[in-house]
Amino acid sequence: MKYLYTILALALITSCNAPMQDNGEPEGPHTSIEWQIWAYSTAAPDYIAENATVFDGPGGNLLREGTNGWTCLPANPRGMSDPENGWIDPHEAMPACGDGEFFKWVGAYFVGETPVMEKDGFAWMLHGDMGEDNTTPMVMNKEDAAPGHWIESGPHLMMMPKDPSSLEGMTTDFNSGAPYVMFAGTPYAHVMYPVQDYYKHTKE
């Protein structure tokens, strides 16, 4: 019986010393294929991430072939702060996991063209982004943003409408916790849906 108590005590100590939460991040360099697949695919919920296609960047190398029509890749146009060692963390990479319509929107956005879509597009960004001016596309620095309109987002879902005018009259207030419009009045207007911990970067 004493031996049994000893085993139980050791098991309890071991469980107390174990990590409280394991996010599944692989050990090793952030330039590894394994780390990149983990970092980019976890921008979406598990039920999408596990069967999504993964690239190492827009127009980049295929890291994993998927089967569900969703694609995940890093979307930070600023690039890596330390290219030799890869993205510092998934937040810096700003990965997005989107459907086909979302990537039609993205392709137009980065070349300054009007998106042409067959239907609304959707994308998850559960690692958030590094900050945007909520009123003006392609503003990459807080210093260049309109006063009071800079938002560094935490986890969120986005909806890119086929018809941006359908969002007219919807709030642009990103502080309420409710869905809001980013880039209102432009061809790139879209809806941001905050989820748990959306404001964690604004409090740091």
Residue ranges of each PLM-predicted region?
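Positively charged n-region of N-terminal signal peptides that target proteins for export
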Residues: M1-L4
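C-terminal motif of bacterial Sec signal peptides marking the signal peptidase cleavage site
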Residues: L12-S15
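Short, conserved catalytic or interaction motifs in soluble domains
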Residues: A18
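Primary mode marks residue(s) on the alpha4-beta5-alpha5 output face of response regulator receiver
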Residues: D22-E204
